[in-house]
Amino acid sequence: MRISSTLLQRSKQLIDKYALYVPKTGSFPKGFEVGYTASGVKKNGSLDLGVILNTNKSRPSTAAAVFTTNKFKAAPVLTSKKVLETARGKNINAIVVNSGCANSVTGDLGMKDAQVMIDLVNDKIGQKNSTLVMSTGVIGQRLQMDKISTGINKIFGEEKFGSDFNSWLNVAKSICTTDTFPKLVTSRFKLPSGTEYTLTGMAKGAGMICPNMATLLGFIVTDLPIESKALQKMLTFATTRSFNCISVDGDMSTNDTICMLANGAIDTKEINEDSKDFEQVKLQATEFAQRLAQLVVRDGEGSTKFVTVNVKNALHFEDAKIIAESISNSMLVKTALYGQDANWGRILCAIGYAKLNDLKSLDVNKINVSFIATDNSEPRELKLVANGVPQLEIDETRASEILALNDLEVSVDLGTGDQAAQFWTCDLSHEYVTINGDYRS
């Protein structure tokens, strides 16, 4: 359908994402400090190096991570994975991360550079095999190790560590590349037992976003004591339903890493898989990870819309997720959303070619597809397909109103079971091409 230029322009009004999504204050987990600097790796001289440090000595820390499935895994991914395996997820007390250079597809020299970053931090904290390393930026270029080494020495030498809000925000800034705002989330939680704890998360990513996972780095830290196997299970569950449920452009990076540190600074019994609080913490961590992951989509390169894809009443969770992902990754769906075109045929097409594990999950005679308004306007739901029957005479004016919203929902009811999955995606604009066409310049 063709819509008026006035309506299209209304949707594309500039949004101050920094003001909307960056917190102005917050409380943070006990026993963590962070440091940051501008090492000079980034050409514009902005912050590009950060360190997260566990300072709690009351009990050993635990760590877990989920890494990219890209075959060209970057040196930091391979190195950090080895550290975690050797340490068995215990006594990991630091994370060092740089932006501006991904240290990916850099061969043996890249592996050595990643190890040097780890060794430098290990030496500063006086512990072996206690640091994870992460990098993000341009692929296929070697790190400027003279600048990185000087930067690490500067952070520790000048005691540039803090636990206040500005320190955490600046570390979040130090990992940004094409991001338009730093992604920082912090929340306090209370367990049924009465124990209160804090989760703080940072992420970077705006493009090359597609499971599993994206050109994204994510860090979640907590002062709750969690046994290492339980922490890994918790993070894997949360990632499956958060960072692996987002899409900007369908590209999967070589550097994707989500890690979680638990330092046990809260004086309470360690949580394991058999603990009564385990399921509660797992669900709280999942909801928290979803909030953090959604910020990545909201910052999608050149995007003007945040779109929730809800697939419900599926036979299996996995198939609900596969269909939601297929819709979210479709370039034709994303460009139609940008153009505010109610072309539901593209949504059905994406559902139809989804590679389901069980073909019984999809019955073309039972499917319902709708656009859902998120601004409390009525009617909230606009049916596009009802019980497999296309609604050929939909209200085009109402469709235009819903598609003009900055936030909207695509709802798919499969009618074959009781399982559901959510995906978060964005539209695809001309600006995306501009950003990525000029990325290395």
UniProtKB/Swiss-Prot annotation:
Subunit (UniProt): Heterodimer of an alpha and a beta chain.
Pfam families: ArgJ (PF01960)
Species of the source: Saccharomyces cerevisiae (strain Lalvin EC1118 / Prise de mousse) (Baker's yeast)
InterPro entries in UniProt: Arg_biosynth_ArgJ, ArgJ-like_dom_sf, ArgJ_beta_C
GO terms for biological process, alphabetical: L-arginine biosynthetic process; ornithine biosynthetic process
Localization of this protein: Mitochondrion matrix
Keyword Transcription regulation recorded: no
Stated name of the protein: Arginine biosynthesis bifunctional protein ArgJ, mitochondrial
Pathway stated in the Swiss-Prot or TrEMBL entry: Amino-acid biosynthesis; L-arginine biosynthesis; L-ornithine and N-acetyl-L-glutamate from L-glutamate and N(2)-acetyl-L-ornithine (cyclic): step 1/1; Amino-acid biosynthesis; L-arginine biosynthesis; N(2)-acetyl-L-ornithine from L-glutamate: step 1/4
Catalytic activity annotation: N(2)-acetyl-L-ornithine + L-glutamate = N-acetyl-L-glutamate + L-ornithine; L-glutamate + acetyl-CoA = N-acetyl-L-glutamate + CoA + H(+)
Chief location bin: mitochondrion
